[in-house]
C-alpha cells in the first residue's frame, strides 16, 4: 500500500538542504514511493473537533537551486494521512501546544503522529532530564536568585539556561567570581518570574557536545560531536560550533540505552540526546537534527530506520 505521510515544518523555502533533517526524512519517504503532504503550522485547523489540514503534495530533489515542487493542493481531514511528522522547530510556546492538540485529534482517529503529541507536551527538552538524575550533571530548577547563588557558591563553575531556548540561546557559564551573576540571573528568571536551570559545568565540553539519535528505542551507532568555537562554552552548531561525526563510545551507548525504553514507551520515535562527557544534558523531542552530517560520514541510513519504524507501527495498528 502507498503510505501517505504528512509533515508539519518551518517553511521549506528557507531550509538548508545540506543540513536539514526534515528534508532527509522526506527524501527517504519519496524513495519509498510514499505520498508526502507538506504543511506549516497555520495549515492546521479544527472543525467541530475534526482535525483538518490544507496540504500541498510535494516532490523533492537534491538540488540547491530548486529542491521542492508542489504538485497539488487540497484540504483534507488529517486522519486521511497514515502518519504525520511534527517537525516544527521550537519555540515551544502556546501556539506549538495548540498544534499538538489538533494533531492529537487526528491521532485519536488512527493517524500515527511522530512524535506523540501528548509526549511533546509532557517532555520539556531541558526538564525531561530530571527523570534520569543519575545520568545528568548536578541540576536545580528554580525561579529564586538566592537558590542559584547558593548553588554557584557550592559548585563554583556552573551553567545557567532557560527552559525554552534552542540552538544554545541564552546559555551562560558563570564562574566563581563572575561579577555579572546577579544580572544574568535576573535576565534568565525575568526577575523571578520564570524558572531557570542551573547545572554544574562539565569540563568535557571542549571535546564536544554529542548529539545521539534514538529511533524508536534504538540508539544509532554514530553521533555528531559539536565542538565549541574557540573561547565558547556552547557546542551548538547554531552558536558557531563545528560538527564532527563519531562512533558512539561505550559511555554514550550506556546513557542512550538507559533512556531509550522510556522514549519508546512514550511514543517518542525520533529523539536527539545531548551528552557532554558522561552526562546527559538534554533530551530533544521536538525537531532533532544532525541526520545529514552523520549519514554523510558513515554508511548508515538513519532516515531508513525511521521510515522502517513508522511502517512497523502502522502495520501493528492495522
Curated annotation (Swiss-Prot):
Q: Give yes or no: UniProt keyword Manganese.
A: yes
GO terms for MF:
ATP binding; glutathione synthase activity; metal ion binding
User: What Gene3D superfamilies does the database record attribute to this sequence?
Assistant: 3.40.50.20, ATP-grasp fold, A domain, ATP-grasp fold, B domain
Question: What does the entry's cofactor note say about binding and number?
Answer: Binds 1 Mg(2+) or Mn(2+) ion per subunit.
| Top-level taxon of origin | Bacteria
Q: What is its EC number?
A: 6.3.2.3
Q: What class of enzyme is it?
A: ligase
Q: What cofactor requirement does the entry state?
A: Mg(2+); Mn(2+)
Kindly tell me the pathway this chain contributes to. Sulfur metabolism; glutathione biosynthesis; glutathione from L-cysteine and L-glutamate: step 2/2
> Which InterPro entries does this UniProt record tie to the protein?
ATP-grasp (IPR011761), ATP_grasp_subdomain_1 (IPR013815), Glut_synth_pro (IPR006284), GSHS_ATP-bd (IPR004218), GSHS_N (IPR004215), PreATP-grasp_dom_sf (IPR016185)
- Family note: Belongs to the prokaryotic GSH synthase family.
Q: What is this protein called?
A: Glutathione synthetase
The uppermost taxa in this organism's lineage are: Bacteria, Pseudomonadati, Pseudomonadota, Gammaproteobacteria, Vibrionales
Per UniProt, what is the name of the gene that codes for the protein in this document? gshB
Amino acid at each position: 500500500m502507498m503510505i501517505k505521510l504528512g509533515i508539519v515544518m518551518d517553511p521549506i523555502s528557507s531550509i538548508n538542504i545540506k543540513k536539514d533533517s526534515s528534508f532527509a526524512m522526506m527524501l527517504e519517504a519519496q524513495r519509498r514511493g510514499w505520498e508526502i503532504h507538506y504543511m506549516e503550522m497555520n495549515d492546521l485547523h479544527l472543525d467541530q473537533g475534526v482535525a483538518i489540514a490544507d496540504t500541498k503534495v510535494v516532490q523533492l530533489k537534491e538540488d540547491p537551486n530548486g529542491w521542492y515542487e508542489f504538485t497539488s493542493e487540497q484540504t483534507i481531514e488529517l486522519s486521511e494521512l497514515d502518519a504525520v511528522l511534527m517537525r516544527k522547530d521550537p519555540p515551544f510556546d502556546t501556539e506549538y501546544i495548540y498544534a499538538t492538540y489538533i494533531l492529537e485529534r487526528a491521532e485519536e482517529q488512527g493517524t500515527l503522529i511522530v512524535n506523540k503529541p501528548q509526549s511533546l507536551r509532557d517532555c520539556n527538552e531541558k526538564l525531561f532530564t530530571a527523570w534520569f538524575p543519575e545520568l545528568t550533571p548536578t541540576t536545580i530548577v528554580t525561579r529564586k536568585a538566592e537558590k542559584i547563588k547558593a548553588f554557584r557558591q557550592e559548585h563554583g563553575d556552573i551553567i545557567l539556561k532557560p527552559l525554552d531556548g534552542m540552538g544554545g540561546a541564552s546559555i551562560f557559564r558563570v564562574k566563581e567570581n563572575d561579577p555579572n551573576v546577579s544580572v544574568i540571573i535576573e535576565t534568565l528568571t525575568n526577575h523571578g518570574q520564570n524558572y531557570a536551570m542551573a547545572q554544574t559545568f562539565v569540563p568535557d565540553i571542549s571535546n564536544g557536545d554529542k548529539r545521539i539519535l534514538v529511533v524508536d528505542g534504538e540508539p544509532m551507532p554514530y553521533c555528531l560531536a559539536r565542538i565549541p568555537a574557540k573561547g565558547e562554552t556552547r557546542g551548538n552548531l547554531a552558536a558557531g560550533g563545528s560538527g564532527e561525526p563519531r562512533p558512539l563510545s561505550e559511555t554514550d551507548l550506556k546513557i542512550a540505552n538507559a533512556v531509550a525504553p522510556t522514549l519508546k514507551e512514550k511514543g517518542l520515535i525520533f529523539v536527539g540526546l545531548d551528552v557532554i562527557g558522561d552526562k546527559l544534558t538534554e533530551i530533544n523531542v521536538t525537531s532533532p537534527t544532525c541526520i545529514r552530517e552523520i549519514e554523510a560520514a558513515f554508511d548508515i541510513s538513519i532516515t531508513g530506520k525511521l521510515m522502517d519504524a513508522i511502517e512497523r507501527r502502522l502495520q501493528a495498528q492495522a
